[in-house]
Regions:
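Glycine-rich beta-strand-centered segment in the early N-terminal region that forms part
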Residues: 27-41, 56-103, 143-145
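C-terminal hydrophobic helical "lid"/dimerization subdomain
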Residues: 1-10, 246, 288, 292-351
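NAD(P)H dinucleotide-binding glycine-rich loop of Rossmann-like/cofactor-binding domains
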Residues: 97-178
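Mid-domain Rossmann-like dinucleotide-binding core that forms the NAD(H)/NADP(H) cofactor-binding site
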Residues: 144-224
Length: 351
């Protein structure tokens, strides 16, 4: 059995662009929780936003915070009510804790739980550290065919799955996706897995378009080619860019669905355009029940995640990982909390 230390190393955000390494106590699992030794943690745009701005909307970093919520690892200890046979199993973590008692939770919409505790959302610590705790049923077993990196990236894959579910993507659909970054690429793969026959990714970056094409999407340069005649059944915005959202709405056929995944605060919405064409405009907020679907998509090979990883860093390089996320040559950046430094973080050119 693995000997568990009393303290661990954590990368802690104390304020805007103020990261330090600290020794923290190793958390002790409650009766319904497991203790996970962290293997891989993906860097998300929200981590970058907290690092650069210290807040996202109403969530403010006003006390020290550990970032990171895309997590995989290995169970090393369990609470009193958890089967000890789980110790040693590799897992992917759904990084949230709903109350399980409110109307939303009882209806199955636990992502909307007003009491939600979500990794790396103030004041809840995340996973840029050696160990984390999570309720037993939110630590999903993964087979050896799924790597630690891919298991961590089941979190952004869950975003893509939730977008496809909310859009109601079905066999034969045409799907337009704005943005060829990680979420756009993942959403394109999920759309194909859900049966879409024409998946179009629009991005102004030639490098991102080339990458999206390598994953089987049809690509367009929205600055040079109109998509209005595409008449998509479903439009998914993964760009957060106002012009892309406006164009995507115009490119959605009557009765179609617009799913907002990107982070634009506001955009002009033509109410007559929506009302007279009976468009369904919706958003997604995280996900519910997506990890088993994500695992099945990875095991079947319908979705590939390992090739999205472009950079890998150690715990001493979290600031470097956060500073480089979002650049054109970067798709997914991974932090290995139990490694101090990686000499050559770039593992593949995203081109």
């Amino acid at each position: 059995m693995t000997e568990i230390p009393s303290t661990m190393t954590a990368s802690v955000l104390r304020g805007v662009k103020d990261l330090v390494l600290e020794e923290r106590p190793v958390p002790v699992p409650a009766a319904d929780e497991v203790l996970v030794e962290v293997a891989s943690v993906g860097v998300c745009g929200s981590d970058v936003h907290y690092y650069e701005h210290g807040r996202i909307g109403p969530y403010v970093v006003d006390t020290p915070l550990i970032l990171g919520h895309e997590v995989s690892g290995r169970i090393v200890a369990v609470g009193a009510d958890v089967d000890p046979e789980r110790i040693g199993r590799r897992v992917a973590i759904e990084p949230q804790r709903p109350c399980r008692r409110c109307d939303f939770c009882r209806a199955g919409d636990y992502n909307l739980c007003p009491q939600m505790e979500f990794y790396a959302t103030p004041p809840i610590d995340g996973a840029f550290c050696d160990y984390v705790i999570i309720q037993d049923d939110f630590a999903y077993d993964v087979p050896d065919s799924i790597s630690d990196h891919a298991a961590a990236l089941m979190e952004p894959l869950s975003v893509g799955i939730a977008a496809a579910q909310k859009g109601g993507i079905k066999v034969g659909d045409t799907v337009l996706i704005a943005g060829g970054g990680p979420i756009g690429i993942i959403a394109a793969q999920v759309a194909k897995a859900f049966g879409a026959v024409d998946v179009v990714v629009a991005d102004i970056s030639p490098a991102r378009r080339e990458l999206a094409a390598s994953y089987g999407a049809r690509v367009v340069d929205p600055a040079a080619q109109s998509t209005v005649d595409l008449a998509a059944n479903v439009f998914i915005d993964a760009s957060g860019a106002t012009p892309a959202i406006v164009n995507g709405i115009r490119s959605t056929r009557a009765g179609g669905t617009v799913v907002l995944v990107g982070s634009a605060d506001e955009f002009p919405l033509s109410v007559p355009d929506v009302a007279m064409r009976e468009l369904n405009v919706t958003g997604i907020f995280r996900y519910t029940g997506t990890w088993p679907i994500a695992r099945a998509l990875l095991e079947s090979g319908q979705v590939v995640l390992d090739s999205l990883v472009t950079h890998v860093y150690g715990i001493e390089q979290v600031e470097e990982a956060l500073s480089g996320e979002g650049s054109v040559d970067s798709l997914k950046r991974i932090v290995l909390p139990r490694v101090r430094r990686v000499d050559e973080p770039e593992v593949r050119a995203a081109s």
